[in-house]
Every structure is written in structure tokens, then in C-alpha cells.
């Protein structure tokens, strides 16, 4: 049996649908249940439902054999994990956005940036040769430039609707993201047969 850490929310739902379609799960966990561990009747998969930011930690520390996490979270955290498979679900992009009239070229002082991704944001501005001050926030990132906390934001974008509704425009794409299957190296080799079967099955999308 493989123990799989999944992020709560839409990505978990998409991942579970994918595993059901591939025969790894027989049914969905009860959406009304408060239980965070789901043992599927087929006995192939045990699911741990955790916060999206915690998936990689559970896998890296061998509390789970594998996990499904956004590429944005994995790149931000710099985890020591095997990332053998892009599942091509949960697609979005990490982008720089700002109010109309803001441009990097016209900004001559330290740029104030609000984001949930301080490492990726800092790297982006460093590679541009620009100085920045990072404000790490945990939600409602679009609010920051509207109330003067920041000049711009670095945040995930799917359709761009939330940016537009708040008077922001997308200036640059920093990272294309999608859900990745990750393994800790111990489980990848210790449960190699199950791991390879799981990867091969999910890769045939």
C-alpha cells in the first residue's frame, strides 16, 4: 500500500478523480467526514489530507510515500524529493501583477512586493537586477497594492479574473505550474514495484 499526501481542496478532488479513473481508488472519501486519513477499500492507497504547503514536508520526512503538490509550492520550498511526473492537472501560473501604470522599468527605488512566495519572488527580482522588499502574506494578496502596502504582487493566476476585478494587470509570468507527483527517495526504492506501477498508470492521461 502507498500512503499519499494530498492537498485539501480542488487539487485533491482532481487527483482523486484521476486515481479512480485509473483504478487505484474505488471511491471518493466522504466530503462531510472530518477524518484526515482515508483508507480505500481496494487497499492500494491510503490518503492523508493536509494543507497544500505541508504535502512536501509529509513526503520528505517519510510520513507519506508520495504526494501530489503544485510545482509552485515545490519550487518555493526547495525540497529534496523525486518529482518524476507532471500530472497536467491544477494548471496555473505564478505571475507578477500590479496596478495600471506600474512598470519595472520606471521604478527607481526598492520595489515593495506582496506575496505568498518570497523565495521565488526574490529570485525573480534578483535576476532582473532589481532591489525589492518582500512582504509575506497568507491570503488576499491582491489587496496589498490597493491600500499602499506594496507596489506589486507575485501570486498564482488561473484566469486573471480576480486581478481584473481588483484593478490589477499581469506584467510577467514567473513560473508555469501544475500538479506534480512526488516521492521521497526511500519509498521510491523501497516500494519500487508499487511506485512504478502507480507512476506508469497516472502517466497515461
From Swiss-Prot:
TM region(s), chain numbering: none
Subcellular location: Cytoplasm
Pathway where it operates: Amino-acid biosynthesis; L-histidine biosynthesis; L-histidine from 5-phospho-alpha-D-ribose 1-diphosphate: step 1/9
Keyword Repeat: no
Record's GO cellular component terms: cytoplasm
Keywords: Amino-acid biosynthesis, ATP-binding, Cytoplasm, Glycosyltransferase, Histidine biosynthesis, Nucleotide-binding, Transferase
Molecular function GO terms recorded: ATP binding; ATP phosphoribosyltransferase activity
GO biological process assignments: L-histidine biosynthetic process
Entry note about domains: Lacks the C-terminal regulatory region which is replaced by HisZ.
Entry similarity comment: Belongs to the ATP phosphoribosyltransferase family. Short subfamily.
Protein's UniProt name: ATP phosphoribosyltransferase
Source organism phylogeny: Bacteria, Pseudomonadati, Spirochaetota, Spirochaetia, Leptospirales
Gene that this sequence comes from: hisG
